[in-house]
Amino acid sequence: MSTKYESRYASSPQTVKQYDTQELRNEFLIDNLMQNDTINLTYTHYDRYIAGSAVPTSSPLTLETIDPLKSEYFLERRELGIINVGGTGSVTVDGTVYELGLKDALYVGMGNKDVVFASDDASNPAQFYLNSAPAHTNYPTKKVSKAEANKIELGTLETANHRTVNQMIIGGIVTTCQLQMGMTELKTGSVWNTMPAHVHNRRMEVYLYIDIPQDQAVCHFMGEPQETRHIWMQNNQAVISPPWSIHSGSGTSNYTFVWGMAGENLDYNDMDVAKITELR
């Protein structure tokens, strides 16, 4: 079977503050992504979100339902966001083919039965990063190239957080039930992401860190603003951020991260900022 999955239950901030390093990593780090010829999925009980990957190498991969969904097919009651972080490939949705280059995105609406991933070149396979959330109705499937993303410049080189936010699967570009996805690229010389940090109790979030050079790493910060913890991240690893947690990071070089979130609303700017001087 080419599909593997695991489930993660939600944890309270009172419990998480007692975790040691390995317990934190076991609960929040997703480190089994981007395996050839495999679809890997992590089902988290935070907003019933799924994060995973599909890397078709020797043959195409079909998105299959998993037992926690108790559904006939994967998107029976769900929507799906895809961002390709590898070689050129395609996603076929109920017979319609969508070509995805590096850092292109695709939104797939609820009710689509057949989703098939393929790579153009097995020696440089597509690496499809997948995010999925529960949905209540069908919205049209839509491709969003990186060039079509809504781009926002934030930060400065002086504060080491100069970055470009690429909003891709988001209101104004794609209509979704609750899923939002995009990608933030740090400029050379900048290492901090999402600083000042924030929380948004209305939504959970997952980060996938990419473009981390070999022998470099990113220190991801999580936890309540007054009770922070850290998880060291390598390239192509993801981390789950509960609604009550900050989600920020600092790298030993610049890097990119793909963000995805779901929850109470679709207001990207709905967040509670934590002052830098008050973080603990």
Curated annotation (Swiss-Prot):
Binding site for Zn(2+): 198, 200, 205, 247
Claim: Metal-binding is one of the keywords in the record: yes
Keyword terms of this UniProt record: Cytoplasm, Isomerase, Metal-binding, Zinc
Disulfide feature: none
Induction (record text): By ulvan and rhamnose.
InterPro entries in the record: KduI, KduI/IolB_isomerase, KduI_N, RmlC-like_jellyroll, RmlC_Cupin_sf
Record carries keyword Zinc: yes
Compartments it resides in: Cytoplasm
EC number(s) on file: 5.3.1.17
Reaction it catalyzes: 5-dehydro-4-deoxy-D-glucuronate = 3-deoxy-D-glycero-2,5-hexodiulosonate
A Pfam family assignment: KduI
GO terms, biological process: D-galacturonate catabolic process; D-glucuronate catabolic process; pectin catabolic process
SUPFAM superfamilies documented for this protein: RmlC-like cupins
GO molecular function annotations of the record: 4-deoxy-L-threo-5-hexosulose-uronate ketol-isomerase activity; zinc ion binding
Known role: Isomerase involved in ulvan degradation. Ulvan is the main polysaccharide component of the Ulvales (green seaweed) cell wall. It is composed of disaccharide building blocks comprising 3-sulfated rhamnose (Rha3S) linked to D-glucuronic acid (GlcA), L-iduronic acid (IduA), or D-xylose (Xyl). Catalyzes the isomerization of 5-dehydro-4-deoxy-D-glucuronate to 3-deoxy-D-glycero-2,5-hexodiulosonate.
HAMAP family noted in UniProt: KduI (MF_00687)
PANTHER family, sorted: 4-DEOXY-L-THREO-5-HEXOSULOSE-URONATE KETOL-ISOMERASE (PTHR38461:SF1)
Protein name (Swiss-Prot/TrEMBL): 4-deoxy-L-threo-5-hexosulose-uronate ketol-isomerase
Organism: Formosa agariphila (strain DSM 15362 / KCTC 12365 / LMG 23005 / KMM 3901 / M-2Alg 35-1)
